[in-house]
Structure formats: C-alpha cells, structure tokens
C-alpha cells in the first residue's frame, strides 16, 4: 500500500497478475495502533472475475496472540504509542490466533491506555475490493 491508512480512509493498490498462472491472491495488514491486531485472507480466487467485475469482502480483525493487549504506549508501535511492539523477552503471549475483541481506550476508563475513542474498532474491521481492470 501507500503507507498509513487512517480510520475510515482507504487505499488503492494495482497489481498485475496472469490469472491463468497465478489465480489466487492473499492480503494482510496490521492495525498500526495495536500491538498485534491484523486482518488477512488467503486464497482469494481471481480466476472467475471478468473484466470490469469486482469482488468485495468484509474482513474480521484477528489478534495474533503475540502479547497481552494492555494498550500501553510501550507496547504499541504505531503513532499513538511509539512503543517497541513485540519483544520475545516478555512472557505475556498466548500463541493463539483469535478474533480480536477491540481495544480499550482512555475514553473507556483505562487511564493508562495510549488510545482514544477514535482508535476503537469492531468486527468486521476492514473491507477489501478486488476489481479486474483488464
């Protein structure tokens, strides 16, 4: 993509593929103001799309389980926190990928949270549109 995508904004990426040779697409993106939330989908078929046709899907937000969701600035690598993100020395991981429950912000009563109400999200948390242009 073209960098940071703010809440409610969008980005557009054009790729060239030969659908008879490479008929599937995988996409992934991290929610930057979290320590380990992401969206991702693998194996999206491009083979049946006709020129001008689009496919759209809503994507759920996943928690990668690499660390505790404490919303502290020290653990959030995005602009809201500036922290280090993952650190193997910490022992707060659970190694299980699961649906993300969302974040708790200062506005929700977590006084030491690096996040505010504009960082909240619900599932689904992203939308992907694939359009065949030629």
Feature annotation, model-predicted:
Residues 1-50:
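Structured domain cores in non-transmembrane regions
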Residues 1-2, 35-37, 41-43, 49-134:
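Extracellular low-complexity, O-glycosylation-prone Ser/Thr/Pro/Gly-rich "stalks"
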């Amino acid at each position: 993509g073209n960098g940071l995508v703010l809440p409610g904004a969008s980005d557009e990426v054009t790729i060239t593929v030969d659908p008879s040779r490479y008929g599937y697409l995988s996409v992934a993106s991290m929610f930057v103001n979290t320590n380990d939330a992401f969206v991702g989908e693998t194996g999206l078929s491009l083979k049946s799309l006709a020129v001008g046709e689009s496919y759209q899907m809503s994507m759920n937000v996943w928690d990668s389980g690499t660390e505790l969701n404490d919303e502290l600035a020290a653990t959030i690598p995005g602009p809201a926190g500036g922290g280090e993100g993952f650190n193997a020395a910490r022992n707060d991981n659970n190694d299980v990928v699961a649906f993300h429950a969302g974040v708790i912000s200062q506005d929700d009563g977590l006084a030491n949270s690096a996040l505010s109400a504009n960082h909240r999200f619900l599932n689904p948390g992203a939308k992907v549109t694939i359009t065949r242009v030629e």
